[in-house]
Amino acid sequence: MDKSLRNKKILISAGASGIGWATAKVCLSKGATVYVCDIESKYLNKVKKHPLNNKKLFIYHCDASNELDVNELFKKILKKTKKLDCLINNVGVAGPTGTIEKLTSKHWEKTLKINVISHFYFTKLAIPMLKKNKGGSIINMSSGAGIMGFPLRSPYAASKWAVIGITKTLAMELGKFKIRVNAICPGTIKGDRMVRVIRDKAKFLKISKKAVENEFVSMTSLNTWVYEKDIGKMCCYLISDESSRISGQVVGVDGNTLRMH
C-alpha cells in the first residue's frame, strides 16, 4: 500500500467537496493527516459521516474570503499542530458569465476576493508553519483561463492569472526556506461547478447545454473531461518528496487545452 505521504500534514481550503475533497481522499489514502475547511455546512456534514473520517482527518467551518474567519481557523489548527507540510489553496468560484460591459464592480470584487485574496489570507498564516517544518509545499489552484483567457468569464480569468503571478513570486521569495510553490491548472472538470458553468453559458448564448458540453470537450487535444481525482493525484505528487526540485511551475492537468471560447 502506498504511504508516500505518511506523517505529512496538509491543509486544504474548500476541502469538503469537488477537487478539495477528492484531493483530501487521495492524501488520506497515502497516509497523510489532512485538515479541511469549507464554508458549506452540507458538505462538511457529509465529510463527517464519511468512512475516511478518522484520527487523521480534521474538519472545520471557514469562510475563506473572511480574514477574521481564516485567523480563527489557524488558531484552531495550531492547537493540533505547529507545523504544516503543505497548504493547498483550492477555494474558488466560477464568477459571472457575460461580456465585460454587462458586469458590475460587485461581480469583480466578489470573484477576486474569493479566488485571489483568500490565497493571501491562507498563505500568510501558513508560511510560519511551513518554515517551522523546515520546508514544504504550497499548491495554488489556477486554471487554463489563467493562461489563455476565457471569453465571457473575464473576472474568473483575471483571478486565475493573478494566482499564477502569486505562485511564481512566492516560489522566488520562499525557496531559501525550502518551501516550494506551484500552481495547478485543472481542465474542464466533470463536476457540480461545471454543471453550473454549462447552464449559465447555454442560457447566455441561447444554445443547448449539450452543445456547450461538446464544445468544452472539443477544446482539448485528448477530447476528454478531467476528473477531480486527477487533480488530487497531481497534488499528491507535488506534496511528496519525489517533487523536491519542482517549484515555480504551472502544471496543466487538462487533457491539453487548445483553446477556451
Residue positions per predicted region:
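Substrate-binding pocket helix/loop in short-chain dehydrogenase/reductase
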Residues: 98-100, 104-112, 216
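Short, small/polar-rich loop/turn modules that mediate ligand/substrate recognition or access, typified
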Residues: 175, 180, 246-248
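Active-site helix of classical SDR
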Residues: 123, 159, 167
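Short C-terminal tail/terminal secondary-structure segment
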Residues: 4, 94-97, 148, 235-236, ...
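Residue(s) in the substrate-gating loop at a strand-loop-helix junction
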Residues: 143
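C-terminal helical subdomain
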Residues: 183, 207-242, 246, 253-255
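Conserved glycine-rich cofactor-binding loop
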Residues: 16-17
